[in-house]
Amino acid sequence: MKNLIQSILHSHLIPSCPHADLCGAGGRAWLFHQVLPEDERLAVERHLREFDRLGEDLKVIERDLARSALGNEGVKRLMTIPGVDMVVALAIAAAIGEVRRFDRPEKLVGYLGLNPSVRQSGPGPAYHGRITKQGRGHARGMLVEAAWAAARTPGPLRAFFLRVRARRGQHVAAVATARKLAVIIWHLLSKGESYAWARPALHARKLRDLELKAGYRAERGQKGAAHAYNIKSHRDQERRWVEQAEAAYARFVAGWNPRGPKRARTGAANEGRR
């Protein structure tokens, strides 16, 4: 709707709105003072009404999603992972269904299309290429978006992202982090555990936001479960804790000498060694 309104303004050489939100209170007041033909003004008003209607429908959908998330322990457990919010957690949980269908994390990775493709001819060596991109593409895209968010949050996941980015670039690092998230998600859902490096105050804040979106009453002036997140010293303490975990992970893997799988020698190679 905003783009349609912008196109009408642009067709009449009206400059861009000085307000950040064209459909906000300030933007609408600015629109009211613009000189437009009567039919174009009616079109702008029609687009604004449609924008408001869609906004109300989205609020209802968001409320229903929040209520569904609050009643699902698996979704709340996934939200302990940095970068995973309500939408990502619900999408992943819906795509996975019953996690017992996957007896190993590698099977979940393959189901989401995050495993590398393998090409092999006869007894020759196997060549690993790009990810297969098979399976649930929507969930895979959600995990990649969560990986980008996790890369901006201190913790072992960011250390992993930075390590891969230094060797392969940021896009490969994002996909590798998404695969790492899929493995973590399998373990959390299979074992009924929360993320080991979760920030309790931040998770409590996420859950409180869920309650407000679900229509729970706002209790102003009272210390709720998310009160600790409002204390800066507490937030800083949790941040230092995960930064220490990130530094420990970086030190741990600094001495690794990654090697690929051993390749079986072909007959010609064995004859040459004799």
Name what the model sees in each region:
Residues 1-274:
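A detector of single, family-specific signature residues
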